[in-house]
Amino acid sequence: MRGSSWLCLTQLGSLLLLALAASTSAGAEIQAADCARAAKYSESKRGASMLVMQNGRTIFEHHYANGGSAGGRWPIFSGTKSFWGIAALAAARDGLFKLDDPVSDTITEWKNNPRKSQITIRELLNQTDGIEGASRLQRPSIRDRNAMAIRLSAVAEPESAFIYGPSHLQIFSELLRRKLKGRDVIGYFEARVSNRLGLGGLNYKKDARGNPLPATGFELTAREWARLGELLLGRGSYHGRQIVPAALLREAFAGSHVNPSYGLTFWLNQPAPTAREADMERMLDLHWQDAQWTNVCICKDAPADMVVGLGSGYQRLFVIPSLEAIIVRQGSSARFSDARFLRLVLGRIQ
């Protein structure tokens, strides 16, 4: 099932889950005492910072530990991807493309490839395009990541597998560069996304050609990362300014049939509460052919409308629309459980 048919079904399912989450969670207040217990757990797992906001106000901020500080930026690693996902939606709003356009309309080198010619922009963003993940793209010695990315092999048919890696957004970066016709990709990102969120001095990990590495690189304070959460809760609006239309933003929260727990650069909790809880980072350590992404969730006791920005080492931005809540957790690699942490924050562990 490709493109629009699957999208219609997943959007309908998403709306039903949102309604259910709203009916079961409306009015629920996160308690500072529960947050303190979660912070203690996080700190014991090398947590550096924690921030909880609800209904537009800060209700808990961790007394920073393990090298963290309120004003010190911390690597969010793959949490970077979600910012570029917002940039993709902004570009769609600007009319540069439609999400279901074939990539080969722009990257014409793919026209005669039986697999690559079928790939859509949406499939780049939800990592179901079948292109190898190519973690080697992150090496700083590569002179032109975009050129390398578009030459990568398609190891599976489009929409037949979820293959996580930096390749997909690197290809998107090249597509956006061509669509901008001489305008700078980073300049576009800053004008449409980061400047509007008040974020400057970002590390784009540029290669020798000036191409950004959209898969990773940003360093943010907990408060800065929470601004992306405010944008999501604002249905694409931040401090009264619409960055992406609400209807387009909803498309980012629709999973694919091969991985219902991943949308357009955002992780999803939609399969909860009946799904199997999984540590997404450990799942990503598996070879793509060995990972089973159907019927998994981040936390069965968290609302099904929760969306997540996820970075290595358990960097997390949890956004729960039904609770009007934003939860940021930053730290160093350790054996950390998202599910336990969320149960503590939400008061589901007595």
PLM regions and their residue ranges:
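Active-site Gly/Thr loop motif
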Residues: L199-L202, G255-I326
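Conserved catalytic neighborhood of penicillin-recognizing serine enzymes
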Residues: W110-R139, R151-S160, S167-Q170, L220-R223
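Active-site SXXK
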Residues: G56, W74-D100, L124, F172-L176, ...
